């Protein structure tokens, strides 16, 4: 019997995310990708609806890990505050269920190593956001490197039973 994976993310009532899988947002610069991701994460923090996005993370998968590979610490802090405001949560308190890391200064290999380490040590992560998936690669035009990265995302999503939502910025 095939077991249907738990649905955890919806937009306008249509499923966009399940545990054990991954998805992506793509678009050109300034096309509101990060704003939409902010609404998704805010919905996941509330386990409710924010704007047109809805989320339900099971009790044992309530933690959200947000990885940004491109922006400065200042801009990442602004994104984190926006997420908390959208969720109706205080912006001046640390949360156990929301971890935001900035990997701008790291190499692609080090970024993957850090994310893997965090997932290994945080079994309650239900949603991983990677804002800037391209920065986990050296050469975006390399078929073998692209395949390796997709395989890594598949291993992480199924192995840790979480949903990975990536952001790919188009030029």
State the predicted function of each range:
Residues 24, 127-131, 165:
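Structural motif
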Residues 58-144, 148:
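Conserved inter-motif catalytic segment of the P-loop NTP-binding fold
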Residues 134, 170-171:
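Active-site-proximal loop/turn and secondary-structure-junction residues that shape catalytic pockets
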Residues 147-170:
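Substrate-engagement module of ASCE P-loop NTPases
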């Amino acid at each position: 019997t095939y077991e249907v994976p738990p649905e955890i993310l919806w937009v306008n009532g249509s499923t966009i995310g399940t545990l054990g899988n991954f998805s992506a947002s793509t678009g050109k610069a300034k096309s509101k990708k990060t704003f939409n991701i902010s609404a998704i994460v805010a919905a996941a923090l509330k386990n409710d609806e924010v704007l047109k996005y809805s989320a339900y993370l099971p009790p044992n998968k309530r933690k959200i890990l947000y990885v940004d590979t491109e922006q400065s610490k200042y801009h990442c802090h602004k994104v984190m505050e926006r997420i908390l405001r959208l969720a109706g949560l205080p912006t001046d308190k640390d949360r156990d269920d929301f971890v935001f890391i900035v990997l701008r200064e790291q190499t692609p290999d080090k970024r993957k190593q850090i994310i893997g380490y965090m997932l290994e040590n945080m079994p309650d992560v239900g949603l991983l956001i990677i804002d800037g998936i391209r920065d986990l690669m050296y050469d975006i035009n390399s078929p073998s490197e692209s395949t390796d990265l997709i395989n890594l995302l598949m291993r992480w999503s199924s192995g840790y039973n979480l949903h990975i939502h990536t952001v790919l910025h188009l030029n």
